[in-house]
């Protein structure tokens, strides 16, 4: 299939070249330019030449009288040329400093002085080859799309052809810009030109937009507003001296006198005071409209800008670990009372702790452990703190079930009742807190007091038969009571002593337990009166403790004491 391609009308139309130059100039300045180019790129000359491009039809999709769509293979090697004009930065150090952050540059003075040189570039010997998709319509114009990069080579002639480095740099940069131009900008340029040629409505609208732009430019170039037309009432010069009307009349925008110093004396004083107050951190700041103050000028301003009545006063509240109640810091309450001196701060912090102390009395004490553990705990810091009244008889008195368990002998067996046959080498006695408080030098009679009470009350001694001891052990393990806990250390020691004497084999006890073994009969004779008094006191306090524990944990005691017989300690 053959067709005629007329290239001469495009060469003869002068308006086409003018419009094409404007579109090319806008396209070249649209993309980001390299930093070495410091001015706009202007297309000064455009010539398409006399040699048309060669087109080869590869495919025709649509063919009609007013429309056409096809794929062509285009190759061009003609005499078209393009001339550009711009300005470049000849000092490479200035370009380097402009493209780097200020804190990372050495900041030279004279070496970084800019030096701009006009540059004229001519593009010729353009060779193109590629596949083009062409769509033609009289209503929509011509659309040309390149499927690949059509630019093969071109020649760049510039003012710096004598410098090889600059010439190569310009060649590389211009080729990169032209590739972007052919792929992105050239199809849009061709489409707009075709609309201008074949669509009269588009041409009329474009002419109207051009006239509107010229009118706006003409209006913007007029003279500005004269600041001397309405001078202030009390004008002063740069030194602060007052000016009369004759001096003001002699001033003009073109005169050498500084017209910007024509300010009011009052405003100058206020500005000076404002500057001094900010420089010296003075509390005095003059009241100037539309000024944001960094500090309150007077109590009235603070009252006006204070918060509303509903704004609460913030105060710290502390939570107690292990309890459900929270209390308010006294320092916060005092500071809140001192801060609420202004009339606007009428909020009270009393309501912050209304619901905080609802369960404070019920949960103010430490949580009680209601499991009677006959084994020695791992740490000795869990020993309960006792009052001064029961500090003397804490080791032998029956503790409350609600209290934490007292530490007892360290046993290796899992059975909490049956003692080992032989004492271990690492045997430890229970920690007696009142020994550290009261500094009792003779703790041995306490063990004898428990033994005397066992004999007086008719309880089982260390020489009783094993059946009775087994019955007591089962009862203790079935129903743990505090009285049995208090008597267990004495029973263990007596059984160990009797077992050691029956076998006849001497067993050496640890040195830590020797002060608690009273084998000297003289001590018992001397302390017999003291033992009797202590036994009576212990029995009385045990009854009192039982009564107090019944009142504190009545439901717990009623659950056990109503069904079972009382322990031997409470038998008399």
Curated annotation (Swiss-Prot):
Biased composition (Polar residues): 330-347, 387-400, 460-480
Compartments reported by the entry: Mitochondrion outer membrane
GO BP field: mitochondrial genome maintenance; mitochondrion-endoplasmic reticulum membrane tethering; phospholipid transport
Keyword Mitochondrion: yes
Biased composition (Basic residues): 358-370
Cited InterPro entries: Mdm34, SMP_LBD
GO CC list: ERMES complex
Topology with respect to the bilayer: Multi-pass membrane protein
Disordered: region residues: 210-239, 330-423, 455-482
Keywords on record: Lipid transport, Lipid-binding, Membrane, Mitochondrion, Mitochondrion outer membrane, Transmembrane, Transmembrane beta strand, Transport
Single annotated GO MF: lipid binding
Main location: mitochondrion
Domain SMP-LTD: 1-195
Compositionally biased tracts (Basic and acidic residues): 371-381
Subunit note: Component of the ER-mitochondria encounter structure (ERMES) or MDM complex, composed of mmm1, mdm10, mdm12 and mdm34.
Domain notes: Lacks alpha-helical transmembrane segments, suggesting that it resides in the membrane via beta-sheet conformations similar to those predicted for other outer membrane proteins and porin. The SMP-LTD domain is a barrel-like domain that can bind various types of glycerophospholipids in its interior and mediate their transfer between two adjacent bilayers.
Described purpose of this protein according to its UniProt entry: Component of the ERMES/MDM complex, which serves as a molecular tether to connect the endoplasmic reticulum (ER) and mitochondria. Components of this complex are involved in the control of mitochondrial shape and protein biogenesis, and function in nonvesicular lipid trafficking between the ER and mitochondria. Mdm34 is required for the interaction of the ER-resident membrane protein mmm1 and the outer mitochondrial membrane-resident beta-barrel protein mdm10.
Family: Belongs to the MDM34 family.
Record protein name field: Mitochondrial distribution and morphology protein 34
Organism, scientific name: Aspergillus clavatus (strain ATCC 1007 / CBS 513.65 / DSM 816 / NCTC 3887 / NRRL 1 / QM 1276 / 107)
Lineage: Eukaryota, Fungi, Dikarya, Ascomycota, Pezizomycotina
Gene of this entry: mdm34
């Amino acid at each position: 299939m053959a067709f005629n391609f007329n290239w001469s009308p495009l060469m003869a139309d002068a308006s086409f070249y003018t419009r094409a130059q404007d579109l090319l100039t806008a396209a070249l300045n649209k993309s980001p330019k390299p930093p070495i180019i410091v001015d706009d790129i202007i297309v000064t000359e455009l010539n398409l030449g006399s040699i048309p491009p060669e087109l080869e039809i590869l495919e025709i999709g649509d063919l009609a009288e007013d429309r056409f769509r096809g794929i062509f293979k285009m190759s061009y090697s003609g005499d078209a040329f393009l001339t550009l004009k711009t300005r470049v930065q000849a000092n490479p150090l200035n370009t380097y400093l402009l493209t780097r952050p200020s804190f990372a540059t050495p900041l030279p003075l004279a070496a970084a002085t800019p030096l701009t040189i006009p540059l004229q570039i001519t593009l010729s010997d353009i060779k193109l080859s590629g596949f083009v998709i062409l769509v033609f319509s009289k209503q929509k114009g011509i659309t040309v799309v390149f499927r690949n990069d059509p630019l093969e080579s071109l020649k760049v002639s510039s003012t710096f052809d004598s410098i090889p480095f600059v010439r190569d740099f310009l060649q590389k940069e211009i080729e990169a810009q032209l590739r972007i131009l052919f792929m992105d900008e050239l199809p849009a340029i061709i489409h707009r030109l075709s609309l201008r040629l074949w669509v009269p409505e588009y041409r009329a609208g474009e002419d109207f937009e051009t006239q509107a732009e010229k009118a706006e430019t003409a209006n913007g170039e007029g003279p500005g507003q004269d600041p001397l037309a309405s001078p202030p009432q009390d004008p002063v010069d740069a030194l602060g001296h007052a000016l009369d009307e004759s001096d003001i009349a002699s001033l003009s925008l073109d005169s050498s006198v500084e017209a910007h110093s024509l300010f009011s004396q009052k405003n100058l004083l206020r500005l000076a005071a404002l500057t001094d107050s900010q420089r010296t951190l003075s509390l005095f700041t003059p009241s100037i409209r539309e000024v944001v103050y960094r500090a309150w000028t007077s109590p009235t301003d603070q009252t006006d800008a204070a918060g509303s009545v509903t704004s609460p006063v913030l105060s710290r509240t502390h939570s107690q670990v292990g309890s459900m109640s929270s209390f308010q810091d006294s320092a916060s309450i005092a500071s809140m009372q001192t801060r609420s001196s202004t009339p606007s701060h009428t909020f009270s912090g009393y309501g912050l702790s209304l619901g905080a102390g609802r369960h404070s009395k019920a949960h103010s004490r430490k949580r009680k452990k209601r499991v009677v553990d006959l084994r020695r705990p791992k740490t000795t810091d869990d020993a309960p703190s006792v009052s001064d009244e029961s500090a003397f008889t804490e080791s032998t008195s029956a503790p409350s079930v609600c209290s934490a368990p007292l530490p007892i002998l360290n046993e290796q067996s899992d059975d909490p009742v049956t003692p080992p046959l032989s004492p271990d080498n690492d045997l430890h006695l229970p920690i007696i807190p009142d020994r550290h408080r009261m500094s009792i030098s003779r703790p041995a009679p306490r063990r004898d007091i428990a033994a005397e009470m066992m004999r007086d009350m008719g309880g089982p001694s260390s020489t009783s038969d094993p059946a009775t001891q087994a019955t007591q052990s089962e009862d203790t393990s079935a129903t743990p009571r505090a009285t049995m806990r208090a008597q267990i250390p004495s029973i263990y020691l007596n059984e160990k002593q009797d077992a050691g004497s029956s076998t006849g084999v001497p067993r050496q006890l640890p040195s830590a337990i020797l002060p608690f073994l009273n084998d000297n009969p003289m001590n018992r004779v001397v302390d017999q009166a003291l033992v009797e008094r202590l036994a009576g006191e212990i029995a009385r306090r045990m009854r009192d403790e039982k009564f107090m524990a019944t009142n504190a944990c009545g439901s717990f005691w009623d659950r056990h004491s109503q069904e079972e017989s009382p322990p031997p300690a409470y038998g008399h």
